UniProtKB/Swiss-Prot annotation:
Signal peptide: none annotated. This is Probable transcriptional regulatory protein RoseRS_4362. Belongs to the TACO1 family. One of its GO terms (biological process) is regulation of DNA-templated transcription. The keyword rRNA-binding does not apply. Keywords: Cytoplasm, DNA-binding, Transcription, Transcription regulation. GO terms for molecular function: DNA binding.
Amino acid sequence: MSGHSKWHSIRRTKSVLDQRRGQLFTKLARDITIATREGGSGDPEANFRLRLAVDKARAANMPMENIQRAIDRGLGKGGSDAAAIEEIYYEGYAPGGVALLIEAATDNRNRTASDVRATMTKNGGSPGEPGSVSWMFETKGLITIDLSVKRLDPDEVMLIAIDAGAEDVQIDDDIVEVYTDFKQLAAVRQHLIAAGLPVTGAEKTMIAKTTVQPDTADALKAMKLIEKLEDLDDVQKVYSNLDITSELAEQFVQG
């Protein structure tokens, strides 16, 4: 899972630097609305998916009134049209045979599908049929621990995470990524918090069963395509089976 971890870390850094605040808030609001509707409750204590979405929004300094408005939309209050927003996945390939699973939240399937296809085609990718790559991924839980918030021995943190039920632990400088069975995400998260670890995020993720390492040129093109897709307003996340070296990751960040 090391290649995924490195790419995930690079994307986290670049998204903070590149993504417009307004666009970020729109994506976070859609997450909250869908979580509220799917979980059947506007109370984060009773709706774990909503709690994760709200925590993520707060971490991005999203105003509380925006968060509440998104929750109200999910509850159908004030004549809002939460039912119009649906979660949908698109599939395809980036240069180098890199598989892409694209998660979107949209109120217009035709618009989103058109935007995704156009972006992929323009950047050397190829759209795929439903099921063409989704079988390559597994749903997992991802918990992020930031050791710059509280200095702890990384090896000790790893042992605590494994004892809590983690399936894999990746350490990249001060960031520790803990991967879990998705159904155990809430329990593992609570265990880590109770152990005093500085948990800064928890979310659903999709992990590739196997990864690919294309040559440098194709890897850079694949990363650029993923970045372009994630810049689309309706796209929430893009999962891939891309594996890259630390050197290539740095090259991409530096542009």
